[in-house]
């Protein structure tokens, strides 16, 4: 009798596990500003097709009220589309997942504006043929990788939301944050030019750019962990993640690792 009860309990457990609804995460790479091929209405229509329970935005908590409504409606595609969507479907929940205080953090550590100043200096050196052949090859490849992405970003969103485009984004960002440091870490121009941080300390372009490189990893890894935390708190829900499409490859790569062995499915917005 006890054996029969035990078998029944095991069967019930197995069946309940099989019928437990999977959590779905749909990462949508976006263009932040309205364009003819992608605007807030485009994104709203995508959300209509998906019918998510949660929409996660590339913002930190400072942009939200205590009940997770926008403090202000931005003119970004995401802000306008989300506002329109929750007005129509008020039970849908918005959540932030961005690295907290991203911009202040970058300014305070000195990675901004040294990142932009550094890439401008590399470009200037290349234009007057002061880079070595190896350095020029790195910089030219970095610039060339942007061209196909500009073309893809001018097409329908399926064109910049797929593994092929993700791989181009990954290579382009690798060149920006890893390969360009082979120039900045070698050439004296980047060790002898400085920016003054808000606290009065000086930081070289070389050190500032290295911090920018490190922050690219830290930011994306943190965003993926935040997405995962929200997902695990809301089992069985359909969760849309909105991100600039250049972040998509990194976030998806991290989520694949974080969701391994869990009842969570990663999907494209156009998959049924």
Name each model feature, range by range:
Residues 2-8:
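Sec-dependent signal peptide recognition
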Residues 11-23:
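Bacterial Sec-dependent signal peptides at the C-terminal "C-region" and cleavage site
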Residues 20-37:
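Boundary/entry segment of secreted carbohydrate-active catalytic domains
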Residues 31-34, 60-64, 100-104, 245-248:
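Solvent-exposed loop/turn segments at secondary-structure junctions
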Residues 36-50, 62, 68-72, 84-85:
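Membrane-embedded segments
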Residues 51-57:
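Proline-aspartate-enriched helix->loop->beta-strand connector
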Residues 78-232, 254:
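Hydrophobic, often amphipathic alpha-helical segments used for membrane interaction and targeting
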Residues 210-272:
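A cross-kingdom marker for long, charged
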């Amino acid at each position: 009798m006890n054996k029969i009860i035990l078998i029944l309990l095991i069967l019930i457990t197995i069946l309940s596990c099989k019928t437990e609804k999977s959590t779905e995460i749909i990462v949508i790479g976006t263009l932040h500003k309205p364009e003819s091929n992608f605007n807030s209405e485009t994104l709203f229509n995508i959300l209509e097709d998906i019918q998510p329970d949660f929409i996660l935005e590339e913002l930190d908590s400072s942009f939200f009220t205590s009940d997770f409504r926008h403090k202000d409606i931005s003119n970004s595609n995401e802000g306008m589309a989300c506002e329109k969507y929750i007005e129509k479907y008020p039970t849908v929940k918005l959540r932030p997942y961005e690295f907290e205080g991203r911009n202040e953090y970058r300014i305070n550590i000195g990675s901004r504006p040294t990142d932009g100043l550094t890439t401008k200096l590399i470009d200037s050196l290349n234009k007057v043929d002061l880079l070595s052949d190896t350095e020029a090859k790195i910089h030219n490849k970095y610039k060339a990788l942007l061209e196909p992405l500009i073309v893809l970003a001018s097409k329908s969103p399926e064109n910049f939301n797929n593994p092929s485009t993700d791989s181009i984004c990954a290579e382009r960002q690798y060149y920006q944050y890893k390969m360009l440091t082979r120039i900045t870490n070698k050439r004296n121009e980047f060790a002898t030019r400085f920016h003054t941080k808000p606290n009065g300390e000086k930081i070289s372009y070389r050190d500032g750019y290295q911090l920018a490189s490190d922050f690219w990893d830290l930011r994306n890894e943190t965003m993926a962990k935040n997405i995962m935390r929200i997902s695990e708190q809301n089992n069985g829900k359909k969760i849309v993640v909105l991100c600039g499409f250049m972040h998509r490859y990194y976030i998806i790569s991290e989520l694949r690792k974080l969701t391994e062995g869990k009842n969570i499915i990663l999907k494209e917005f156009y998959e049924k």
